[in-house]
Amino acid sequence: DNGSSPTGNSDVYRGIAAFSEPETQAIAFLIDQYPFSLALNYHTYGNYLIHPWNHIDEPCPDDESFKNIGRTYAQQNKFAIGTAQETVGYKTNGGSDDWIYAHDAGQKVYSMTPELGLQEDGFWPAKSRIRDLAKTTLKGNQLWSKMAHRYFELSILDPLYLIKSTDNQIDILIN
């Protein structure tokens, strides 16, 4: 019961069994049907960006990639990046990030959870706070959508290389 509860009126209710709730069934269907590369699962609160593994105390195989992608997302909002243990201070079970990342749907999906807002916002922020909270993730969401199709890092080590990019192609000319 780390980070979740079997009690229906709890803020961290997980359902009676894996995929027992219609929302989780819908997400599982989408992950199985479409070739996602990135996923964001919004929660409140803490101004964190949480990535797998969250159910155990060890880094996932792509821990460094998650941290690099997370730093890109958090450039504007300065969210703290890490696992649930590293950010909120406890492990969580039954989380969507761990399942989406580990699920073999034909490709790896980097799934992360932005936790929006401050402690005083709580799990259910006031309606008057929604717009400001949404603004904290706007730039990150825009960057995230750009990364969803093509994500790579390129360093020019030699000025003799000329790089030209179009939507579907990168040309490198060596002088």
Region spans (language model):
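Catalytic cores of processing enzymes, dominated by hydrolases/peptidases
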Residues: 54-118
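Surface-exposed, proline-enriched loop/turn segments that connect beta strands in immunoglobulin-like
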Residues: 156-160
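Active-site/substrate-binding loop(s) of hydrolase catalytic cores
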Residues: 1-60, 103, 113-125
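Extracytoplasmic/secreted proteins, especially bacterial periplasmic and envelope-associated proteins
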Residues: 22-29, 35, 64-68, 72, ...
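His/Asp/Glu-rich mid-to-C-terminal helical/loop segments that flank catalytic regions of hydrolases
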Residues: 123-155
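Structural beta-strand segments of beta-rich domains
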Residues: 166-172
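Intrinsically disordered or highly flexible coil/loop and linker segments, enriched in small
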Residues: 36, 82, 147-150
